[in-house]
Amino acid sequence: GIGTLLMLIGTFYFIARGWGVTDKKAREYYAITILVPGIASAAYLSMFFGIGLTTVEVAGMAEPLEIYYARYADWLFTTPLLLLDLALLANADRTTIGTLIGVDALMIVTGLIGALSHTPLARYTWWLFSTIAFLFVLYYLLTVLRSAAAELSEDVQTTFNTLTALVAVLWTAYPILWIIGTEGAGVVGLGVETLAFMVLDVTA
């Protein structure tokens, strides 16, 4: 419930900020940005009502794992939108944008396959696959997109570098949380994991 509320607040905040904006690029930015918490609020509401939840039997585990696949559905839409925001800010070309979003989708889908796998080996293999895709996304952000942004005004460069640093730090926490959470080694419980993912989602 809290996640839904916070995401709705974020949605209305960006609607208010973007209201009456006439600059074409700024309107584009707000249109994309509004969608991110809007989609996330729908995903969190579905999880609140027990939709988007399944159980997976994993070899060697006494109890089946509860997997919130709605979380992955959320990320499959919201993470490309966040990257699209950064790419448009950097004035990146279509090939760069397509590559970045394609690899990002691969990262999310392989993470979901890992979460739904029935053996520890398969789960960790898919996690590794997803993490490699994430590292590629990170590399693209910090090199290709940063180079594109470097050709623009100082204000744009500063904004881009700040947002990219924030994304890099926050997104790095996701594969770490996956591997130590219930979907991985089980060092932290479902409650802590869910809360941590909510904090990361809201902050990102």
UniProtKB/Swiss-Prot annotation:
Transmembrane segments: 1-16, 31-50, 71-90, 97-116, 124-143, 167-186, 193-204
GO molecular-function terms, A-Z: monoatomic ion channel activity; photoreceptor activity
GO annotation, biological process: phototransduction; proton transmembrane transport
Keyword line: Cell membrane, Chromophore, Hydrogen ion transport, Ion transport, Membrane, Photoreceptor protein, Receptor, Retinal protein, Sensory transduction, Transmembrane, Transmembrane helix, Transport
Compartment annotation: Cell membrane
GO CC, one annotated term: plasma membrane
Membrane topology field: Multi-pass membrane protein
Keyword match Ion transport: yes
Extracellular side: 51-70, 117-123, 187-192
A family per Pfam: Bac_rhodopsin
Intervals, Cytoplasmic compartment: 17-30, 91-96, 144-166
Function: Light-driven proton pump.
Family named by the database record: Belongs to the archaeal/bacterial/fungal opsin family.
Name this protein carries in UniProt: Bacteriorhodopsin
Gene: bop
